[in-house]
């Protein structure tokens, strides 16, 4: 493996990222990310791979509700109604990332990596993968109170799998 800025990531996660980037390059699919609880870790992981500039279009780190609204076009009313950690918000984040980029495929992550707030459980994470043709996949995971780092690494595996599924159609 080449030297990366994420030495704490397990080798299998880095290997999955390399495989995904090769698949995206082969299919000429450009990717955008919209991350909340992972704080840009997916974008960092993808851009650690040599040649990522050919397929990684951009990444949004929208940790706050305000950022989700300002950068991705979500409405505060939807966040208030559904909760920032919900299927609806994850799907809207993915759609907003596509709308605000030139990418073909978006992956959004929103969840509780550490202790949950008043409206959720530790380790609850929602993922959405949206394609330009309108196809969207959602995945809800209940990872439990594993701690921020462990939850974020688990999120990388799930996100890479969803991106692969999105590329393959």
Q: What do these predicted regions represent?
A:
Residues 1-169:
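Short alpha-helical segments enriched in small residues
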């Amino acid at each position: 493996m080449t030297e990366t800025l994420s030495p704490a990531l397990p080798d299998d996660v880095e290997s999955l990222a390399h495989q995904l980037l090769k698949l995206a390059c082969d299919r000429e699919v450009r990717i955008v990310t919209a991350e909340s609880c992972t704080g840009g870790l997916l974008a960092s992981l993808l851009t650690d791979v040599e040649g990522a500039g050919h397929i990684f279009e951009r990444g949004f780190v929208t940790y706050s509700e305000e950022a989700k609204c300002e950068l991705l076009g979500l409405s505060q009313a939807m966040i208030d109604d559904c909760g920032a950690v919900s299927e609806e918000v994850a799907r809207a984040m993915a759609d907003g990332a596509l709308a605000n980029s030139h990418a073909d495929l978006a992956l959004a992550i929103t969840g509780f990596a550490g202790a949950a707030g008043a409206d959720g459980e530790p380790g609850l994470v929602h993922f959405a993968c949206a394609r330009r043709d309108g196809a969207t996949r959602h995945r809800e995971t209940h990872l439990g109170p594993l701690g921020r780092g462990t939850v974020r690494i688990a999120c990388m595996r799930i996100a890479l799998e969803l991106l692969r599924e999105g590329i393959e159609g």
